[in-house]
């Protein structure tokens, strides 16, 4: 809930700046058309099913709010630094994720800090139950937690790979320590971070994979990552609660004991793959996204939640907006490296919705 209020506050700041100074390029507004199909499908599903659950209408407004909030932040940072470019903004994002990761570690080490930080934000019933049930079993983020934290930490790893390939790294040692820190803490918060790590690794290896210069440069960085990662993993095995370590690396521990590359989470995910039994659900959905204290149909799989809510139309239209953002961005930036980044991020989003 606190994220929503902060987003609204930043959005109001962005709207105010736009009205006063009109610093937003009006051509960017065209991406909002990508929100219209999913909003219309949401209205149709809510009315036809008589549930009046217009989740994706509110989603559309939240994306517009994020749009203005993002421009407000870009404007503020741009005023403080001359020649502020995309790489600078991506660095700011990475630093914020690093600070969030540090805060998650400190909240685990100091329970009083955890209690204080969570006392100043409001959670819904489902989030509150998840925080209570997992306390002491895994690290908990603040503002960004669980699956959401895994997504953000994974995205930070992908963006850091872009910065490395774009030669925007000054102190490689410090940069690598931050990369490993975000990776390890991200895994301790949500194992979904591993997906982002795999995408960042794929991005790194696929870029100019035949170029001798880049092969040497990438191998040196990967070696450095491995050395620091070994130190980081050794630290958490020595100094963190065994329950947290067992949870974070459960999949690898099971694999080592011939139980397969699985965990309680992946086993539960398999159980969540339930499919609609009626044609009506495939066409217009059931018009429900969340219930009071659990997910509709007890599934947290992204594609299935979209399918049960608004049928195939919502499941397809949901991805029109990110596609239009990427299309508009590609028209602005011609860098092959950046184009590859957008492709990786879009593929990352598609894969995450299987979870």
Question: What is each residue range found by the language model?
Answer:
Residues 34-40, 52-76, 88, 92-97:
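Aromatic-anchored transmembrane helix interface
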Residues 10-23, 155-167, 312-332:
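Hydrophobic, aromatic-rich transmembrane alpha-helices
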Residues 244-313, 330:
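Long extracytoplasmic/lumenal interhelical loops at the membrane interface
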Residues 1-5:
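Short, small-residue-biased leader/transition segments that mark boundaries at the very start
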Residues 91-118, 141-189, 194-207:
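Alpha-helical transmembrane segments of multi-pass inner-membrane proteins
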Residues 19-33, 163-176, 212-219, 326-344:
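Membrane-interface helix-loop-helix junctions at transmembrane boundaries of multi-pass membrane enzymes
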Residues 169-171, 198-210, 309-353:
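Hydrophobic transmembrane alpha-helices and their immediate junctions
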Residues 102, 108-111, 205-257, 277-280:
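A membrane-periplasm/extracellular boundary helix in multi-pass inner-membrane enzymes
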């Amino acid at each position: 809930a606190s994220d929503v209020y902060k987003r609204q506050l930043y959005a109001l700041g962005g709207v105010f700046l736009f009205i006063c100074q009109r610093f937003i390029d009006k051509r960017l507004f065209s991406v909002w058309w990508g929100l219209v199909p999913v909003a219309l499908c949401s209205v149709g599903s809510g009315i036809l099913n008589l549930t009046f659950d217009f989740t994706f209408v509110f989603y559309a407004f939240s994306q517009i709010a994020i749009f203005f909030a993002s421009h407000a932040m870009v404007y503020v940072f741009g005023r403080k630094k001359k020649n502020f470019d995309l790489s600078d903004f991506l660095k700011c994002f990475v630093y914020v994720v690093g600070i969030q990761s540090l805060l998650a570690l400190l909240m685990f080490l100091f329970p009083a800090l955890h209690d204080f930080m969570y006392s100043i934000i409001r959670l819904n019933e489902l989030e509150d139950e998840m925080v209570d049930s997992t306390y002491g079993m895994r690290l908990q983020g603040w503002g960004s937690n669980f699956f959401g934290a895994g997504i953000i930490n994974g995205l930070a790893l992908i963006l850091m790979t872009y910065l490395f390939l774009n030669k925007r790294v000054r102190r490689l040692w410090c940069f690598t320590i931050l990369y490993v820190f975000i990776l390890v803490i991200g895994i301790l918060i949500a194992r979904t971070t591993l997906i982002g790590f795999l995408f960042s690794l794929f991005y790194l290896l696929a870029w100019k994979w035949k170029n001798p210069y880049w092969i040497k440069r990438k191998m040196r960085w990967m070696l450095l990552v491995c050395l620091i990662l070994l130190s980081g993993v050794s630290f958490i095995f020595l100094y963190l609660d065994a329950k947290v370590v067992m949870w974070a690396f459960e999949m690898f521990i099971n694999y080592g004991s011939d139980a397969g590359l699985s965990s309680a989470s992946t086993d539960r995910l398999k159980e969540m793959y339930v499919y609609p039994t009626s044609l009506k659900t495939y066409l217009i959905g059931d018009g429900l996204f969340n219930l009071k204290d659990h997910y509709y149909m007890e599934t947290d799989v992204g594609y299935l939640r979209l399918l049960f809510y608004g049928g195939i139309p919502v499941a397809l239209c949901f991805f029109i907006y990110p596609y239009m953002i990427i299309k508009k961005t590609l028209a602005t930036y011609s860098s092959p490296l950046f184009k590859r980044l957008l492709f990786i991020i879009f593929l990352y989003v598609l894969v995450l919705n299987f979870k």
